[in-house]
Regions:
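Carboxylate- and glycine-rich phosphate/diphosphate-binding segment that chelates Mg2+/Mn2+
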Residues: 1-55, 156-157, 163
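Alpha-helix C-capping/helix-to-loop hinge sites
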Residues: 3, 23, 27, 47-50, ...
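Alpha-helical scaffold segments in soluble metabolic enzymes
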Residues: 11, 15-26, 39-42, 46, ...
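Buried hydrophobic positions in well-ordered alpha/beta secondary-structure cores of metabolic enzymes
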Residues: 40, 61, 75, 83, ...
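Active-site pocket-lining segment
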Residues: 72-130
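C-terminal charged capping/lid subdomain of soluble metabolic enzymes
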Residues: 107-173
Length: 173
């Protein structure tokens, strides 16, 4: 979701995504599969490497901070409900990067947002804000709070006003 290229983070994140997209459904269908679990663990470990290099994480993560800190939504679940809508909202600013995500997920012709939403659904996880108890009347307060979170400044598409975040939240609601 970031704006700048970083060859190291791109390579590591790409490998993480490839591993996780393969491992997570396998783990769901066969939790005892130690090879799938190892692949998932390696994918998870690689996925956090970008944060150690200072790569910005964007609005999806910023909204997640608000949902977790103020509404008790677990961090992993916040990504399930905010990432597809953030991808959709950001597509005008980073469509080529999103096409790479689609390629890494094995379907280069599909939209990254659709692939992520489908993965969340196949894993049986909540995919909308209302699925985790967020009320529509809370969207403005969530947006107002999220505007002050640092990852908003690293979003690929500039966020200038809380109404931009409300648009993303409406897509996720």
């Amino acid at each position: 979701m970031r704006t700048a290229d970083d060859a190291f983070s791109d390579a590591v994140s790409g490998q993480a995504l490839t591993l996780l997209v393969r491992a997570l459904p396998a783990i769901k269908s066969a939790p005892q599969d130690l090879d799938a679990r190892l692949e998932g663990q390696l994918g998870m470990w690689l996925s956090i490497s970008g944060s150690s290099t200072g790569v910005g994480v964007g609005v999806s993560h910023a909204i997640g901070h608000t949902l977790g800190g103020s509404y008790g939504v677990p961090h992993g679940i916040t990504s399930c409900v905010t990432l597809p809508s953030s991808l959709r909202w950001n597509a005008s600013a980073n469509l080529n990067r999103q096409r790479e995500v689609s390629r890494l997920m094995g379907k280069p012709e599909a939209l990254a947002a659709d692939l992520v939403a489908d993965l969340v659904k196949r894993l049986g996880l909540p995919g909308r804000l209302r699925d985790v108890g967020i009320r529509r009347e809370d969207l403005q307060a969530i947006a107002d709070h999220t505007m002050h979170d640092a990852p908003v400044r690293t979003n690929p598409r500039k966020i200038e006003h809380p109404s931009d975040i409300v648009e993303i939240l409406e897509l996720a609601w």
